[in-house]
């Protein structure tokens, strides 16, 4: 089974829960909520709606998976998961948590009392990417049965077990400021299908600025085999995107704010707005119409 959702609510909860049946709760990374609040989240969601939970940063960033202190915070996360009926708890370590701390991670995962929880771990940073480190990590995660979390456009998980958990952070130079093209989502589908099996569920969580749109398009592709139109087409598509910022605005501001967004020139061709605006004069524009006069495609 493939499950699709977003990291946090990019739109209102009602609209989100009408579209998806999965969300990763991110606010728990910054503050442990009251149980009464958590119960309300569960009660207000549809019965078949699934929560996953991101563990508080004290576990990973402050205590760096060191026993005792990290274990205490882990125990505090369990009632949150239980009251949400969440079966997955995500631990995300920072890029400063490098492979030389693997022993601490192994001891932590061996020591936690998971009960019904599946604990998954997202490593961050380039130090985890060389083959020797990946093989060592695979051996440890398999031994403690902790699925590895990655962005599949950067690297595939070294171990999944019964759950593959993927988090998409954006692929551009500014990462989060990114929109996935139909071509990229088609490749994502290929990756996801290669991980899915009768014994393994695949969770796909989008965590980029256009996460709601991208996750919706990916869900539609999974269900129908086709992508819905991204926007209007041709000049109308450009107008639609240009209308999303305030004017007057400089070229550099426009490029920074919305240059990463995709334009559909026709049914077969998507380009980023920044490609169309690259050669327009560097000046202040009073409105979208002034920009359109300078654009050729």
What is each PLM-predicted segment?
Residues 229-297:
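Basic helix-extension-helix modules of the SAP/HeH family
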Residues 1-233, 244-245, 264, 286:
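Residues lining hydrophobic/aromatic ligand-binding pockets adjacent to catalytic sites
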């Amino acid at each position: 089974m493939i499950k699709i959702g977003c990291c946090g609510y990019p739109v209102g909860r009602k609209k989100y829960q009408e579209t998806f049946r999965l969300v990763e709760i991110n606010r728990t990374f910054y503050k442990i909520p009251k149980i009464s609040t958590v119960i309300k989240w569960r009660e207000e969601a549809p019965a078949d709606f699934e929560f996953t939970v991101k563990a508080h940063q004290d576990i990973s960033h402050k205590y760096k998976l060191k026993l005792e202190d990290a274990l205490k915070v882990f125990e505090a996360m369990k009632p949150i998961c239980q009251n949400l009926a969440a079966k997955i708890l995500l631990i995300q370590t920072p890029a400063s948590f490098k492979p030389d701390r693997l022993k601490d991670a192994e001891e932590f995962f061996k020591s936690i009392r998971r009960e019904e929880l599946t604990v998954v771990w997202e490593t961050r940073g380039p130090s985890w990417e060389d083959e020797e480190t990946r093989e060592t990590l695979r051996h440890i995660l398999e031994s403690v049965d902790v699925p590895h979390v990655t962005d599949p456009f950067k690297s595939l998980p070294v171990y999944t077990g019964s759950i593959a958990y993927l988090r998409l952070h954006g692929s551009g130079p500014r990462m989060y400021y990114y929109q996935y093209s139909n071509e990229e989502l088609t490749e994502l589908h290929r990756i996801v299908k290669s991980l899915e099996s009768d014994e393994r569920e695949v969770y796909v969580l989008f965590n980029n600025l256009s996460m709601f749109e991208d996750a919706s398009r990916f869900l539609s592709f999974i269900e129908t085999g086709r992508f819905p139109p991204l926007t209007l087409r041709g000049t109308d598509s450009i107008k639609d995107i240009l209308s999303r910022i305030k004017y007057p605005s400089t070229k550099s501001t426009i490029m920074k704010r919305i240059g990463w967004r995709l334009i559909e020139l026709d049914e077969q061709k998507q380009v980023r707005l920044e490609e169309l605006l690259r050669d327009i004069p560097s000046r202040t524009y009073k409105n979208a119409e002034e920009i359109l006069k300078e654009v050729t495609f």
